[in-house]
């Protein structure tokens, strides 16, 4: 990992003890960059460029009044890639809805995407390894790494949509069908307002930003 510039050597470990002195290692923040795309707002794609410690070094946004398309996502990725002379280690994309482990967005009500191979589309267009995941799961991972979150935690996100994420023993629980946190369209009031999904009285239709 040192040869690949993921880690760097700080020097020998000077603690007392027998044997050969080991090297103290740290994350190398001067070489690789990571592209991050947030699609939690279907009409505003947000992008960031970060080093390997997670420190954001650049941000940009792409308005999409008619809803974000795959072309919008690819355009934003390419814009961020072009903004730095440093190599890109990977692209991470957070999407509302149900995302399969292979990066296929099975269903996103707000983005109006169904069975979309987003990972493959972005990788083919950029040549950069890409990870696609649910936005609420991604938020919980961020809270775990950079916040004050325990290894056993739950996060509930309320915005344009409603979602939940669960972490047990430092593992995000997605379920066999990748729907463990999909609470938005659980019907809580059969006589409630019509939801974007077409059903009546979904949790999202009662407590999302648009309804509160």
Question: What residue spans do the PLM features occupy?
Answer:
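A short, polar/charged loop-to-alpha-helix boundary motif
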Residues: 67-73, 179-191, 195
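Active-site core segments that coordinate phosphate-bearing ligands/cofactors
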Residues: 185-212
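Conserved phosphate-binding catalytic cores of ATP/NTP-utilizing and phosphoryl-transfer enzymes
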Residues: 9-12, 16-34, 133-153
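Short beta-strand-to-turn element immediately C-terminal to the catalytic PLP-Schiff-base lysine
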Residues: 50, 142-143, 165-169, 173-175, ...
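Gly/Thr-rich phosphate-binding beta-strand-loop-beta motif of the actin/hexokinase/Hsp70
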Residues: 21-59, 155-168
């Amino acid at each position: 990992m040192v040869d690949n510039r993921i880690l760097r050597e700080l020097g020998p470990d000077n603690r007392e003890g027998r044997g050969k002195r080991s090297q103290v290692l740290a994350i190398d923040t001067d070489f690789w960059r990571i592209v991050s795309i947030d699609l939690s707002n279907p009409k505003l794609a947000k992008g960031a460029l970060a080093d390997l410690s997670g420190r954001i070094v650049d941000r940009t946004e792409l308005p999409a009044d008619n809803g974000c398309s795959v072309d919008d996502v690819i355009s934003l990725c390419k814009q961020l890639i072009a903004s730095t002379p440093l190599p890109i280690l990977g692209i991470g994309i957070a999407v509302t809805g149900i995302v399969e482990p292979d990066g296929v967005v099975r269903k996103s009500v707000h983005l109006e995407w169904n069975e979309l191979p987003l990972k493959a589309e972005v990788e083919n267009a950029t040549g950069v390894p890409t990870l696609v995941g649910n936005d609420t799961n991604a938020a919980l991972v961020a809270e775990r790494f950079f916040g004050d979150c325990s290894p056993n935690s739950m996060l509930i996100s309320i915005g344009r949509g409603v979602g939940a994420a669960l972490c047990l023993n430092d593992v995000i629980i997605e379920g066999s069908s990748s729907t463990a946190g999909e609470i938005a369209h659980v019907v809580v009031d059969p006589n409630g307002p019509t939801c974007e999904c077409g059903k009546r009285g979904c949790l999202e239709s009662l407590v999302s930003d648009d309804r509160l």
